[in-house]
Amino acid sequence: MTDELLNERYALAIERIRQIPAEKSVPQPYRDFFAQMAQYLCKMDQIRSRIAEGYLKTASEEELAVFNREPYEDVIGERYETSYGNPAFAVRALGETHGRSLCCLYRELGNAVVWVYEDRLLELTAAMELYLELYAMFEEETLPSAQYVKESIYWYVSDYAEERQEYQVREIVDPSLHFVKDIVMESDLTDLRYLYQYGEYITENEKGTARFLNTFSQEEIDAMARTYTEGFRKCFLVARKDLSKKKTVSIRFHIGFERMIRAAILQFREMGLEPVISRGARRTWVAGASANKQYDYDHRNDEALYLNEDLVKRRLRAMQVKYDEYKELAGGYAGPAVVETFGEVPFEPVNKKQALHLNERQQKLRVGFQNEAGQIVNRYIKDDEYGYTIIAYPMPEIDPRYEKIFREIVKINTLDYEKYQRIQQYLIDALDEGASVQVLGKGENRTDLRVMLHHLNDPAKETNFENCVADCNIPVGEVFTSPSLTGTTGVLHVTGVYLNELYYRDLCLTLTDGMITAYDCANFEKEEDNRTYIEENLLYHHRTLPIGEFAIGTNTTAYVMAEQYSIAGKLPILIAEKMGPHFAMGDTCYAWAEDSPMYNPDGKEVIARENEVSAKRKEDPSKAYFGCHTDITIPYRELQSVAVEKADGTTIPLIEEGRFVLPGTEELNEPFG
């Protein structure tokens, strides 16, 4: 489509929308909804004009803070209780027939802020035209049926599936997308007005991070960036993958870290890698604060309104076509380098019956789509040629002692990896003598789990456990394996854990032959709500998941620091998994790359790269992979013992009463004092 035609479509749409707030052709209660949405879209048009006039460059920081808040004000704090974006209010105000559909429309129009700031006129215009189409329906003498409204939204999603898929592919592999990169590389980072150029919601977390990093010397910033970029390079080195044939890396970070990211961009360019930086499909790759996490949670299943088999097929066809179109860029893509953040108050969502929920058939469709999509991506971005690194830093919200905690995390991220590599080898040597590992909790922790290990045909050349220090997952350290499922049986329990930004109280999983057979938590009063919470956010609508990983974290320094500052509950799994034994539900760490040999520093091959489920990949990949991998850690304070069980019935104690007891590992207890 030509720019001229697109501009004409936009002009016609916004001209019509400007007229709607004064009209009375739509009956109540829908009139108020459409009028409010029209006012919002007019506000987006005004913001677009002011950006084009250079307002983001000339306004004061105080003025920009007000400007930044305007697109989000309807969902912030108590305002959300009477917002049409709240499904509970929308259904109450607009009725059962249309409340959920119009609430879904509200969320879709809420994406306009991104399209406006990035000047993505096609998406903005298409959403406006959808709004006008629905408005015209409600102007008719007879109100539209619920099905008619749903079909209109369905065709909007279907008609633009190819355009959206193209942009999603480009967000991963195309370095010519420069919106975020320009902000990072061209802004005066000492002038915090730059934070408002993204259009993301900016809070004291983002401002405080940028302000604090501005107190660092350039040498300190370069060192932080070097830890991160070297982790990425080492990931390829350790896995014996050739980084030299790659051309791009995807940088993902939270707004406020631009000084570090600018240094990292320059360092990646020295490696021959041009960064690709974008928000991502769900605005999680480069993001500011969430204006309201409950709002995000309420809309997590909005596609339940229109998801069907035809749409899944259309999306998969579009994905295949677009990856093929960008196959050269995809082949040069090395992987993501991620800067995570932590420290926000753990979010405990409210389950709302008025929110959209996938039915059983749609759950199967989503799982099927994820499986097929994973196979398409792996054809163009081969896992055995791919790497990644992840590092994490705290946000100011974590504690009044934020600056001290931040510097402690910097130290933890740069611990002596050679020391941990040496100590962890003692653990691996002991573990390789075993047929299984028994893990027992203590106190309120009810964990009692036996983890089965693969048989080593040649212990002199083979090992079950990878000696993991600070490459892919920063900081050090852990040893991990893909357990054998048969015989892996028992209960995994944690009194409280924060997984993927959601809190679980008294999470309990029962495993039989390595598969989850029962699950519960204590987040909600009703057992059904607790099970649904786990099914949606941990099982991801799979009926069951295998245990994909068993590991022993060795970073006692991080654990003691977390206890000292009382922040253990706010740490991301990236750090928490190094602070005790942990178990991952879902795919193994070697998903899609099981046939690529992996070696430890001592030269032994890590042979535990698959389990009984992932072994099905050669016959039917859809039965081998789940598209998820969620780590659950038992902290040392809740740990009675970890012991290797040998085939002859004898045991080798590794941890007792939360302390390492295996000869050669005692040094790990020093941080405890």
PLM-predicted stretches and their roles:
Residues 1-486, 655-673:
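Active-site bordering "gate/hinge" segments
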Residues 252, 278, 391, 440-442, ...:
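Generic beta-strand/beta-sheet core signal
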Residues 256, 344-346, 395, 444, ...:
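Short, glycine-/Ser/Thr-/acidic-enriched flexible segments
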Residues 375, 423-424, 476-479, 492-497, ...:
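Glycine-rich, charged/polar anion/phosphate-binding loops
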Residues 484-541:
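Long, well-ordered mid-to-C-terminal structural blocks that present hydrophobic/aromatic surfaces
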Residues 487-489, 504-506, 513-516, 545-549, ...:
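Active-site lining segments that contact anionic ligands and/or coordinate catalytic metals
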Residues 518-590, 594:
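Dual-mode signal for accessory low-complexity, basic/Gly-rich regions
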Residues 602-673:
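Extended hydrophobic packing segments that form well-structured cores
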